[in-house]
A protein has these predicted regions:
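Ligand-binding clefts/hinges and TM-proximal coupling segments of bilobed small-molecule sensing domains
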Residues: 62, 139-154, 191-193, 228-256
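Bilobed "Venus flytrap"/periplasmic-binding protein-like clamshell domains
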Residues: 34, 44-54, 116-151, 165, ...
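Acidic, polar ligand-binding/catalytic clefts
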Residues: 53, 66-128, 140-141, 199-202
Length: 256
């Protein structure tokens, strides 16, 4: 092969490597939200964490994970202190500053949790009239009728744990949370027997990995999405989903 052709091939290879090579690890921030991502005995765990970690491992990308309260996650990203946010909702207002990986990590279902000692059935929005509903700061609820309704009052709590604690102490009437996340947290806190939820959802959404809008990360977003789609076709992905399907199957099961 002529020298010139060898030089062209070498240059192309170097460019390809530069796409994913980084001088430092990819910095990803997230808020603990079991079973999707959380810390257990000092180790990062969770369905979406394991999915993302496996995909990034296959792509040869080293990652530095950091847990922060959700509003601080958004601030760290805005100030350039993070390269990505794990498990974020994709909304139009974020598109300008965030590059969303096209393939979603998980689909979620927001429901209203209640105390078994004081149930509030929910079928329609008017059922919530004059109630106080616990919400999470910085979270987006994509059902506009629920989000904008003035039929009920909202009260933010500093954490998901605090929200459920307020619910069992009757400081709020209902708490909105993802169905699976709420069940996992209730089991973890030993509140599973005291809480239940209305099966009618107040909305559904998807969780994504969002990256900074820089040249190198744009290519990474495309490769991550393609590799995630491949992973979803494998038996390992099916086993992972089954392991986190119910609170008792995952590492964050109720404490003794």
């Amino acid at each position: 092969m002529p020298l010139f052709q060898r030089q062209i091939i070498a240059a192309l290879c170097l460019c390809s490597l530069a796409i994913t090579a980084r001088a430092e690890p990819l910095r990803i921030v997230t808020e603990a939200w079991a079973p999707y991502v959380y810390e257990e005995n000092g180790q990062t765990a969770g369905l979406d964490y394991e999915i993302s970690a496996e995909v990034l491992r296959r792509l040869g990308v080293e990652v530095e994970w950091q847990f922060l309260p959700w509003k601080r996650c958004l601030l760290a990203f805005e100030q350039g202190q993070a390269d990505g946010i794990l498990d974020i909702f994709r909304i139009p207002e974020r598109e300008a500053n965030m590059l969303f990986v096209e393939e979603p990590l998980s689909e979620i279902e927001f429901v209203l949790f209640y105390s078994r000692s004081r149930p509030y059935p929910y079928r329609k929005l008017d059922d919530l009239r004059d109630l106080l509903i616990g919400t999470s700061p910085g979270y987006w609820y994509n059902d506009q009728a629920f989000r904008d309704s003035r039929l009920f009052s909202r009260e933010e709590a500093p954490s998901h744990e605090a929200n459920l604690g307020k619910l069992v102490r009757q400081r709020v009437d209902l708490v909105v949370n993802d169905r699976r996340a709420g069940l996992f947290l209730a089991a973890h806190l030993g509140l599973g027997a005291q809480l239940d939820y209305n099966t009618k959802a107040v909305g559904t959404d998807r969780l994504y990995l969002a990256l900074r809008r820089t040249n190198g990360l744009a290519t990474l977003a495309e490769r991550f999405s393609a590799e995630l789609r491949r992973f979803k076709q494998e038996a390992a992905y099916t086993r992972l989903q089954a392991r986190y399907a119910e609170p008792g199957n995952a590492p964050i099961a109720a404490k003794d």
